[in-house]
């Protein structure tokens, strides 16, 4: 079962960008991610963030912006999460890689809450990644 799931994720990952550009493929991918994400989380626990991080490495700026807009409502919780902070760091580096700015809604959370997040056990890692990405810009 585990090998089949990984094989499936690799095949989806290989065509993720192409599928996300197609309107029907994009809707199906969004549904798939929600179900596959919960399945991965239940099967692998904290290691389920690795496939998500790999997907973020492959995406172009349009897809990254779409995913960042999905994070809007619970972005601070992701930053503070033991596993979610790694996904947010990868998202920040994805924006840096593509040469576009992190959306204002996410940047404002990082800037306005930076003192609080710097004191947080996991939040400080995201603040450091954000600082490095803005310094290197």
UniProtKB/Swiss-Prot annotation:
GO terms for cellular component: cytoplasm. It is found in: Cytoplasm. GO terms for biological process: regulation of translation. One of its GO terms (molecular function) is RNA binding. Keywords: Cytoplasm, Repeat, RNA-binding, Translation regulation. Pumilio repeats lie at residues 70-105, 108-137. InterPro entries: ARM-like, ARM-type_fold. Gene3D superfamilies: Leucine-rich Repeat Variant (1.25.10.10). Its main location: cytoplasm. The pumilio repeats mediate the association with RNA by packing together to form a right-handed superhelix that approximates a half donut. The number as well as the specific sequence of the repeats determine the specificity for target mRNAs. Sequence-specific RNA-binding protein that regulates translation and mRNA stability by binding the 3'-UTR of target mRNAs. This is Putative pumilio homolog 25. The gene is APUM25.
């Amino acid at each position: 079962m585990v090998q089949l799931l990984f094989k499936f994720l690799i095949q989806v990952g290989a065509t993720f960008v192409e599928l996300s550009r197609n309107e029907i493929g994009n809707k199906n991918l969004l549904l798939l991610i929600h179900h596959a994400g919960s399945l991965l989380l239940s099967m692998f626990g904290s290691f389920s963030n690795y496939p998500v991080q790999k997907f973020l490495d492959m995406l172009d700026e349009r897809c990254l912006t779409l995913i960042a807009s999905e994070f809007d409502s619970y972005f601070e919780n992701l930053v503070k999460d033991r596993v979610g902070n790694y996904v947010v760091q990868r998202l920040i580096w994805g924006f840096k890689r593509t040469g576009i700015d992190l959306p204002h809604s996410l940047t404002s959370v990082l800037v306005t809450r930076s003192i609080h997040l710097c004191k947080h056990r996991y939040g400080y890692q995201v603040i450091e990644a954000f600082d490095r990405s803005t310094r290197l810009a």
